[in-house]
């Protein structure tokens, strides 16, 4: 497999006319241009190709959807992509933040949609999510927030608003800051759905 993540998100990434998918080959013979069934929807931004000797050259889209080989390939690719992103988040933060600014919404949608469909995406994706920390003045992972919590703090505090100024002005934010508690700022409408879908973080 040869996969990559573009440097910037297409304008129509979250619109119905966007066609995700990976090029599919078998033994170097082209099968399909955009195989949507290979990767989960929340990785719709990933581009590239897969060349597998285990796929039939004469296979319909319906048969592809039922192909065990394709499902195994897809699961392995998903694990590899998530592992790569997790490593970037930990070791190459500036690069990861560039990725997050372009494609972070897809990860958050993946967390929320997983809750709706019964797939447990939260465990796979929770350490990839970044939110703005009021105390640290930067984007942090939930792990980083928890590691910086005060002794005895049991909850993750967050506030929702259209921008930093509007959240700063909330009485609740002021109250938490006065108690020296960190607050995560949620600016994107999907943020609140994602963080509620996570339920808890340990």
Model-predicted regions and their roles:
Residues 1-202:
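Conserved GHKL (Bergerat-fold) ATPase module
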């Amino acid at each position: 497999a040869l996969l990559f993540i573009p440097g910037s998100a297409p304008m129509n990434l979250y619109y119905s006319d966007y066609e995700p998918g990976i090029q599919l080959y078998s033994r170097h013979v082209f099968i399909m241009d955009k195989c949507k069934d290979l990767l989960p929807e929340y990785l719709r931004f990933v581009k590239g190709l897969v060349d597998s000797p285990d796929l039939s050259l004469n296979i319909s889209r319906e048969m592809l959807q039922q192909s065990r080989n394709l499902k195994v390939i897809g699961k392995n690719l998903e694990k590899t992509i998530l592992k790569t992103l997790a490593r970037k988040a930990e070791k190459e933060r500036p690069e990861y933040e560039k990725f997050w600014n372009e494609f972070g919404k897809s990860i958050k949608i993946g967390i929320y949609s997983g809750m709706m469909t019964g797939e447990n995406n939260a465990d796979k994706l929770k350490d990839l999510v970044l939110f703005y920390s009021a105390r640290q003045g930067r984007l942090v992972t939930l792990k980083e927030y928890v590691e910086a919590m005060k002794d005895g703090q049991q909850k993750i505090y967050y506030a929702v608003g259209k921008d930093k100024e509007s959240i700063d002005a909330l009485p609740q934010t002021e109250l938490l800051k006065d108690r020296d508690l960190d607050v995560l700022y949620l600016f994107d409408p999907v943020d609140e759905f994602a963080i509620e879908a996570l339920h808890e973080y340990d």
